[in-house]
UniProtKB/Swiss-Prot annotation:
Coiled coil: none annotated. It comes from Arabidopsis thaliana (Mouse-ear cress). This is Mitochondrial import inner membrane translocase subunit TIM10. GO terms for cellular component: mitochondrial intermembrane space. The modification N-acetylalanine is found at residue 2. One of its GO terms (biological process) is protein insertion into mitochondrial inner membrane. Belongs to the small Tim family. PANTHER family: MITOCHONDRIAL IMPORT INNER MEMBRANE TRANSLOCASE SUBUNIT TIM10. Heterohexamer; composed of 3 copies of TIM9 and 3 copies of TIM10, named soluble 70 kDa complex. The complex associates with the TIM22 component of the TIM22 complex. Interacts with multi-pass transmembrane proteins in transit. The gene is TIM10. Keywords: Acetylation, Chaperone, Disulfide bond, Metal-binding, Mitochondrion, Protein transport, Translocation, Transport, Zinc. It is found in: Mitochondrion intermembrane space. Disulfide bonds join 36-61, 40-57.
Length: 83
């Protein structure tokens, strides 16, 4: 369910904000995927599927990435008034 548009924000501004947020999320996902893949998957593929070690590594990597991303977000928004 979408959030209501904040008071004083036009629909065009809200659309622009949503578009910026979507671009940020896509970039975040791409960086996460690239970082964890490079860290956890061997450069020379031996099997078509991820092995158990690679699976565990990717799981931990993604978990840590999201945890740090949340911490950074909280720190950045700590001094800002709510929108």
């Amino acid at each position: 369910m979408a959030s209501p548009i904040p008071v004083g924000v036009t629909k065009e501004q809200a659309f622009s904000m949503a578009q910026t947020e979507m671009e940020y999320r896509v970039e975040l996902f791409n960086k996460l995927a690239q970082t964890c893949f490079n860290k956890c998957v061997d450069k020379r593929y031996k099997e078509a599927e991820l092995n158990m070690g690679e699976n565990s590594c990717i799981d931990r990597c993604v978990s840590k990435y999201w945890q740090v991303n949340g911490m950074v977000g909280q720190l950045l928004s700590a001094g800002k008034p709510p929108v």
